[in-house]
């Protein structure tokens, strides 16, 4: 017999249960109904393993002040970092472009709304509160975003991004950003244009 516990584990994050924390608690409950020697325990930790391995780098491409609100438009999207639309917060760090005109006069801002490139209301990625003023050319680097971001990344408005791997402290490009050519590959229409 077997018991499949599925996924949804938090392993790999500080302050959260780690994989070894789950199994003694699970085993204690299962022993009431199953014989350990005759029962296979299956776990599917996928996203919690893959997320730790990936980051997603976005750049601020536009800044808009509307009334008392500041909106930052990025070249990434919530669809890239949270395709299941369930996260309420994101782990990230900033890489500020100090070559920006006015960068030396950055101030702390009470509120900045970080948005993706799409026109959809759900593409508001997060509210950046009481933080340094972000400007065009700054980067927002999202951490722990590997689970499902590659397989569920839509081709909505933008194509798949460049993908890099870090090996021995160096970055290597392993996939080029898609262009219309890759999007149209295997299309009958595209094939006719090539004749």
Question: Where are each of the predicted segments found?
Answer:
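Alpha-helical scaffolding segments of alpha/beta enzyme cores, especially the outer helices
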Residues: 21-29
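Conserved "cap/hinge" positions at secondary-structure junctions
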Residues: 13-14, 144
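Glycine-rich beta-strand-to-loop/alpha-helix junction loops that act as flexible
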Residues: 3-13, 43-48
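Short intrinsically disordered, low-complexity coil segments enriched in acidic
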Residues: 1-5, 39, 166
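Short helix-capping segments at alpha-helix termini
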Residues: 31-38, 66
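Charged (often Lys/Glu-rich) extended helix/loop segments that serve as interaction or gating elements
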Residues: 25, 40-195
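Alpha-helix N-cap and loop-to-helix initiation/capping positions
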Residues: 14-22
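Short hydrophobic/aromatic-rich motifs at helix boundaries and adjacent loops
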Residues: 1-2, 31-32, 133-135
């Amino acid at each position: 017999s077997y018991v499949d516990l599925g996924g949804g584990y938090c392993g790999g994050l500080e302050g959260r249960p780690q994989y070894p924390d789950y199994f003694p608690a699970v085993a204690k409950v299962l022993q009431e109904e199953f014989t350990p020697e005759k029962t296979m325990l299956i776990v599917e930790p996928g996203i919690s393993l893959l997320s730790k391995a990936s980051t997603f780098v976005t750049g601020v491409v536009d800044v808009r002040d509307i009334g008392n609100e500041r909106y930052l438009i990025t070249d990434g999207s919530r669809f890239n970092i949270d395709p299941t639309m369930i996260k309420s917060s994101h782990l990230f760090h900033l890489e500020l472009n100090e070559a920006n005109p006015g960068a030396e006069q950055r101030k702390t801002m009470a509120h900045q709304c970080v948005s993706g490139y799409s026109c959809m209301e759900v593409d508001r990625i997060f509210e950046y509160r009481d933080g340094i003023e972000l400007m065009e050319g700054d980067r927002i680097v999202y951490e722990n975003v590997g689970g499902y971001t590659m397989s569920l990344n839509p081709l909505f408005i933008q194509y798949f991004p460049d993908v890099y791997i870090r090996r021995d402290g160096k970055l290597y490009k392993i996939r080029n950003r898609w262009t219309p050519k890759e999007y149209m590959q295997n299309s009958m229409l595209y094939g006719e244009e090539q004749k």
